[in-house]
């Protein structure tokens, strides 16, 4: 079997979006399961719109998702001489020609065709004319066949046939000599020996044109697979209005790469009823021919569910660094407080993203300076001062700071003062965290640590006394 070579070829004119990453994932999986090579190519010939920041974001996003590449990144902007060479080759073989049509003529042609309810297309005006010996500006057009059809077996959609009469002579070199997209893509796929082109179905109309250029060059055709687009929950094409669409935005919002990868592979592909896939299972089970031909609808709630699943199941050690980043963004000094792994293990069941986890864990690393007004009014009452003082004294005298011993102190104090456990636990929780929501109170006390816990209880008792005064 021929050595499989796939590629991902984004344009660095914006962020790396969800649709692009899913395409990259499918292409990467196909290469990996066939022991092939995955090539990264940056299509940066649009100099005006391409930015280094976009290139950096693409590379960073792929690395975050651990979509690694065997070759590249190759940059089209560094291959201009090669494109010009191929353009000259096509002109010499009479598979391309100079077109001197003015912009005005082409606009008039288009308007006439639209008026006559015809498909706008170039009419071949310069197709059989000899090159002019003048300095008039010209573009170079590919001489598309006028007979027969382009037929190819799409990996996802099956057999596709396009009549050559539906295709006009596309421009392959602009008036400044710069190559166009359809030319550069063909040359790159040819030179890089790409065997399988897996890309979005917005490129499907380009495929017959590119196949005809490859035929003219005498090149071997790759296999093509066109992945349907992703729709928003409202059924319209996924865009910024649907929320986060940049891959790095998901990272910054506290999603795990494992969750996003798992979610994307299920967008348009399924393996029975299985929802959770390890990276190894993705490589083993993914089948490009089983990808749905219909657009997939993006479901933010499903992604959140998956993210929480991975928060609960991935080792805290693996996500500690990302959690630290979220805490630091919230202005937290991590030198004081429990280990990140301990907090992750405690909070994973209660939060859906690392960002939410960080926001709900600030009190482990910061002193509580104020209380939620409603929580204080309900729980920090004069009647609770004596039980709080008792808890504070008992905690201070514990021989060792262990969860079981802490729990006993709270239970015994509640019984002594004829309180239900919640009637004592909630005031302690407000004292420790400033609010009424936290993990179990004994675990919260344990992680906050004895010294900090005692200070916070003292502060709450003073707060109540001030209110009484």
Swiss-Prot record:
- Which E.C. number(s) belong to this protein? 6.1.1.17
| Any one biological process term the GO annotation gives | glutamyl-tRNA aminoacylation
Query: Known CDD domains for this protein?
Result: GluRS_core
Per the Swiss-Prot or TrEMBL annotation, the motif 'HIGH' region is positioned at 10-20
Could you tell me which InterPro entries the record lists for this protein? aa-tRNA-synth_I_cd-bd, aa-tRNA-synth_I_codon-bd_sub2, aa-tRNA-synth_I_CS, aa_tRNA-synth_I_cd-bd_sf, Glu-tRNA-ligase_bac/mito, Glu/Gln-tRNA-synth, Glu/Gln-tRNA-synth_Ib_cat-dom, GluQ/Sye
Q: May I have one GO cellular component term? A: cytosol
Q: What PANTHER family does the record tag this protein with? A: GLUTAMATE--TRNA LIGASE, GLUTAMATE--TRNA LIGASE, MITOCHONDRIAL-RELATED
The similarity annotation says: Belongs to the class-I aminoacyl-tRNA synthetase family. Glutamate--tRNA ligase type 1 subfamily.
Q: What does this protein do?
A: Catalyzes the attachment of glutamate to tRNA(Glu) in a two-step reaction: glutamate is first activated by ATP to form Glu-AMP and then transferred to the acceptor end of tRNA(Glu).
Can you state the subunit structure given in the record?
Answer: Monomer.
Name of the protein in its database record:
Glutamate--tRNA ligase 1
